[in-house]
Amino acid sequence: MKQKDLKRAYNNVLAQAISGSKQYLFAGNLFGDIFVLRIKELDKGSEEPPGKLKIFPQGSDVDINYLAFHRDFLIVGAVGLIYGLEWNEEEESLATKRSWEVKIPMQVDAVEVPDVNSMWLDSENSILFAGCGDGVIYQVSLEDGRIQREYRGHTDYVHSVVGNANGQIFSGAEDGTVRVWSTKQQQHTSMLEPYKNPNLLRPDWGKWIGAVAVNEDWLLCGGGPKASIFHLRSMESTCVFSFPGRVHLCDFVDDCVLIGGEHNHVQSYTLNGVLQANIPVEHTACYSAVWQTSPIKFISIAGFSNKLHILKDFRFLDSKIEMYGNVEGEENDPEEEDELIEKPLTVEAA
């Protein structure tokens, strides 16, 4: 099988991000490629297909696990490191040279370099929180690349980390716990163990938590246990969602809850658990969903397939956008070796 065909068959997109201008969508995969879509292409009529994507290879040794966007930089979370690439909007181009790079420290008893599995950006304070495969959440200053502190408590790798405007951080991990942290305290302030709730436990799928989301009043999480919503003050489960698969993504979208994972549908519910939309997807598993309401309203769902699934009204599937096989200049280029990315001086953790 040719490399191009192999990538089309086994494309696994774990990460997406939207540019600060809300005009570009970035998608990164485990082959080390970053795709860029002009969001205005989604506003074309249904008869006219979206334009081709741009691709920016990072090298076959770079697993792109998570993406975030801050100021003029696309932030990439990979294996053992986080780095920033400058985005030139006029030229619609990502820099080939990394502007900065932060290495995740290896623990004394570690046998492998930890993955950066999830990131949450506090854009107002230019701080990034990275949940990693060593069970630690790292607080990184984007001003100087310094790791400011480590949040320790999880006993297995962190799958998801999110935060809110109140200085709280929420993390879900393989150890089956959801922990709530304060940037002003050393230890977690509270902890949930959803698998201990008989209404949530699914014994065949384990206790791990694959995704966490939060808004002003509610905490949403799921994984092996069923997806459920908890009130932030009481930390009591108020609603259990009927999503039938393992949960790898969840989010509050407008006044609804979006849930996806190892299932052939992504589902949208009311906060009371009423199913509103059952959206068919071609992904073997869905790992990422990003959305915005303006200037162009859409959700993009990605996972283990070669297609981005686009919803314009948040309830119905509007289009599927191919990635490999739909890249500018691809039909003219021979198979090439991976482009090498110039690497700057590395900021080591203290």
Swiss-Prot record:
Ranges of the WD repeats in the UniProt entry: 151-191
Biased composition (Acidic residues): 328-340
Keyword Chaperone: no
Role of this protein: The THO complex is required for cell proliferation and for proper export of heat-shock mRNAs under heat stress.
Gene Ontology biological-process annotations: mRNA export from nucleus; mRNA export from nucleus in response to heat stress
Self-association state and partner proteins as the record states: Part of the THO complex containing HPR1, THOC2, THOC5, THOC6 and THOC7.
Xref: Gene3D superfamilies: YVTN repeat-like/Quinoprotein amine dehydrogenase
Region (Disordered): 328-350
Name used for this protein in its record: THO complex subunit 6
SMART domains registered for this protein in UniProt: WD40
Keywords: WD repeat
Single GO cellular component term: transcription export complex
Pfam families: WD40 (PF00400)
Family: Belongs to the WD repeat THOC6 family.
